[in-house]
Amino acid sequence: MIAIMFLAGCATETSTTVAPKQVTSAATPYSGAKNPISVGKFDNRSTFLRGLFSDGVDRLGSQAKTILVTHLQQSNRFVVLDRENMTEIQQEAKLRNKDQKLKGAQFVLTGDVTEFGRKETGDQQLFGILGRGKTQVAYSKVSINVVNVLTSEVVFSVQGAGEYALSNREIIGFGGTASYDSTLNGKVLDLAIREAVNRLVEGIERGAWKPES
């Protein structure tokens, strides 16, 4: 009983903050024109979470849209217009007795998660006697189209892809293999979208698409 109490008393709790990664342009100054844009539909077109027993809620697409809006704003190249919370925004304007002065977007960004998957690989050393390991791998690919709101023309398109891997190894009874890590889904999706936004910014910088004068 004393031993159990001693072990319970030795439990420790730690925490730390982690700086989220940003798109490349977030760290560079910019004084040029910014595109007023909004984000339209962003759907999960991959087979992930779309099986026979799916509840029909597109959580992956919704997560991707949230990540995209964040990286677009942090890129310092766009005026990002919120179209998801129109009712709440209108209500707050009324509470302030102010008329809304909503901006219109020049472009709407639409996108899809075109590929998404998880896999696990493992190995053993001397039939597992000397150790064994497991690697969890997550892969994601997204496509984004820039659509002119007046003409419905797709003026620019980009793709982004990323892969995340988590490895653990147990050697002669020490260490342990990791259980399923669901955070890899968000990490690899963020990586792919961040890469796509980098390509969008590069397109502006080389004149492939640009704000209206």
Language-model-derived ranges and their functions:
Residues 1-3:
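Sec-dependent signal peptide recognition
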Residues 10-80, 85-97, 102, 166, ...:
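A structural "domain/chain start" motif
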Residues 12-13, 89-155, 165-179:
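Surface-exposed short loop/turn segments
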Residues 36-43, 67-71, 79-81, 106-114, ...:
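Soluble periplasmic/extracytoplasmic beta-strand elements of cell-envelope proteins
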Residues 155-157, 194-195:
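Juxtamembrane/interfacial segments around transmembrane helices
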Residues 162:
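Short, solvent-exposed beta-strand-to-loop segments that form ligand-recognition rims
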